[in-house]
């Protein structure tokens, strides 16, 4: 591999743009091309990064022409499996945004291809590397068992944000899009195996295909008796009351993410705010002999 990792950036949405900005700034990387379906998005990103990058509207052509050492895939989930496999076949390492694929079979196929080609596969689980979320998980692990984990991320979207959500819904539901993060967090908090999953969804608008939903919630039961709940909905009809709940309760107390700004009215569709924590609120449930809290 060369001194700089020659990387092909695929996708220029919220995450694709963030990754490209990082690659542009890091001395260890050299962007060899930007691939998007939309000419407007790739030209806008190229201009922001100072121009001069090779631009493509066809992924296969970009792979063949640039011969990258690594590919960063931040596209809609229905392209993840095929794009990752093509990158491995081209001899490149892969960074891919979550979810890895639309199905378990698709995910297993990508992992098998990575092993067969001897290339690295990295999946974008940002909360696993977020200092505040790491501490949130560590504090949850001190609360005893079982845990009750309550989380949601509803987004009241309109204009361009609702257009993005409608397009995304054609490929993935809200409950899966961010739910993969929060179920992963629940697994880390409990360090236990999920034994039962249930969920419900609803189609709250005629602006999306008849077989799609824009609201859902799921429940996960764990082997150790812990239970988790996650809710997500997108659209102009969504409530902004308690749309940013990140709360864990155990026998010894509870810990919550208290993000007053990120959880304020009018900010539910602000993607940049979704990973902000601001502060962690810890409550100790121990009672003294007089029946009052030992710690205020």
Name the predicted role of every residue range.
Residues 109-126, 144-151:
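Rossmann-fold dehydrogenase core element
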Residues 127-210:
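Predominantly a Rossmann-like dinucleotide-binding segment in NAD(P)-dependent oxidoreductases
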Residues 19, 40, 51-113:
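Beta-loop-alpha module in the N-terminal Rossmann-like domain of NAD(P)-dependent dehydrogenases
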Residues 96, 121-123, 230, 257:
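Hydrophobic residues in well-ordered beta-strands that form the structural core
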Residues 183-266:
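Contiguous beta-strand/loop segments that form the cofactor/metal-binding neighborhood of enzyme cores
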Residues 1-50:
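N-terminal Rossmann-like dinucleotide-binding module
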Residues 126, 222, 245-296:
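C-terminal glycine/acidic-rich active-site capping loop/insertion
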